[in-house]
Design a protein with these regions (language model features):
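Surface-exposed, short loops/turns at beta-strand junctions within beta-sandwich domains
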Residues: 9-17, 116-120
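Short S/T/G- and acidic-enriched coil/turn segments that sit immediately N-terminal to beta-strands
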Residues: 3-8
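Acidic Ser/Thr/Pro-rich low-complexity disordered segments
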Residues: 1, 30-36, 286-295
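Low-complexity, glycine/proline-biased repetitive segments and flexible coils/loops
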Residues: 43-57, 64-344
């Protein structure tokens, strides 16, 4: 053998060390070297999160969720250089309180359907954001929904080299008692919907982050109807009468089969597809707006006397808004899914 001869060892048990020797010939082992090296089989190509190989597929996914706090931090450890697909969804914005606009969906970034990204062996940071709290009742300042929290993979800050960084959804606007200037929906991954009450005030929806979502809808320029929160697949609907507007649709992402998503409780499964980042529905004096597919929370009407519905967990959906003096629903938490092919 020459100095650069290589070989592949197969059939090794995971996490078991093996001593390797070199012999001159399998038929004539007269010469056997001293110990050449010790090798061990890696138990996996990567570790971190919940590891799933969907039935019948030749790839593995690592699923990361928010388990507490504004952001849950985790480590994705690669045991070798491989190409990795990603789905990164931030937390959704909270719905606005007191005749509010729906919360904007968390920003969504996905490589599936395109080219997987080359990633180097080593430890890589993952963070998964929670949804923003719904707006309260009592003033325009407290009535605006809170923004959702960012999610990221392969880094923590938005300027880290190679990071995939999704911006939290914008909070929904509110009716603006005593301070009409605070009514608009907030900017975010997708924008929050504008609040609805005073016809003289600004009811515009919040703007979206480029490539991550869509704008929120405006509240009605009459009275008592908020705009829908933006979703990853479509803008929030503007209110046009005394009825609340629907949240923007989320986006179907085929990073796993629907059965895998349902079995591991992330995304919203509809018709065999898995949707993420739907906008929150708006509240109104009349009929309330529905949340967008992909975890958007429904709005409520004034007669129901309830808070807006929360966005779906691990979907990044925006929170729904109420049609009366009640609180907005919290945004749904985000999710990070990382996928790589198994060697042939």
């Amino acid at each position: 053998a020459t100095a650069d001869t290589s070989a592949v060892l197969s059939g090794l048990d995971a996490d078991t060390a093996y001593d390797v020797y070199v012999v001159a010939s399998a038929d004539d082992p007269a010469y056997t070297s001293s110990l050449s090296t010790t090798v061990s089989a890696n138990s996996s190509m990567a570790t971190g999160g919940t590891i799933v190989r969907p039935e019948g597929e030749d790839y593995v996914v690592h699923i990361f969720k928010n388990t507490g706090g504004d952001q849950t931090s985790a480590t994705f450890r690669l045991n070798r250089d491989i190409d990795v697909h990603h789905l990164v969804v931030a937390g959704g914005g909270g719905g606005g309180g007191d005749v509010g606009g729906g919360g904007g969906a968390g920003g969504l970034l996905a490589s599936i359907g395109g080219t997987a990204v080359a990633r180097s062996a080593g430890d890589h940071a993952v963070r998964v954001g929670r949804g923003g709290d719904g707006g309260a009742v009592g003033s325009a300042i407290t009535g605006i929904g809170d923004d959702g929290f960012a999610s990221s993979a392969f880094g923590s800050a938005d300027d880290d080299p190679g990071v995939v960084y999704a911006v939290g959804g914008g909070g929904g606007g509110t009716w603006g008692a005593g301070d009409p200037g605070t009514e608009p929906g907030r900017d975010g991954g997708s924008g929050g919907g504008g609040g609805g009450f005073d016809s003289a005030s600004d009811k515009s929806g919040g703007s979206a982050t480029f490539g991550q979502g869509n704008a929120g809808g405006a509240g009605w320029q009459g009275m008592f109807a908020g705009g829908g929160g933006g979703g990853a697949g479509g803008a929030g609907t503007p209110a046009t009468d005394n009825s609340g507007a629907a949240g923007g649709a989320g986006l179907a992402v085929a990073i796993v089969p629907a059965t895998t998503a349902a079995g591991n409780a992330f995304g919203e499964v509809v018709g065999g597809s898995v949707y993420f980042a739907g906008g929150g529905g708006a509240g109104a004096n009349g009929a309330a707006g529905a949340g967008g597919v992909g975890g958007g929370g429904d709005g409520t009407d004034r007669a129901n006397e309830t808070v807006g519905a929360a966005g779906g967990a691990a979907t990044g959906g925006g929170g729904g808004a109420p049609g009366g003096p009640y609180g907005g629903g919290a945004g749904g938490s985000g999710v990070v899914v990382l996928r790589y092919e198994l060697p042939a």
